[in-house]
């Protein structure tokens, strides 16, 4: 971004801080067909971006092929450890974690 410099006064460069109610990110499809979301990470999930990208790719591929993620959540297997992650954990329709600490620690 060569035209982006440090201004001497306030200008139009801003950021957005997003966080879900229970501080668990939402990685899911939306109600709009073909539109997928990776939101609510509070900015602390940047270090997980490669995994988030891979699990979103898996989710999108499955849903676009006809998988009903809402009734049968996609399972993502991590690349290196082969651990299974139930993507229903990050569903927009999940039950909120009432025991959440309300912080990035969950």
Task: Go through each PLM region and give its residues.
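C-terminal lid/capping helical subdomain adjacent to the catalytic/cofactor pocket in oxidative enzymes
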Residues: 31-106
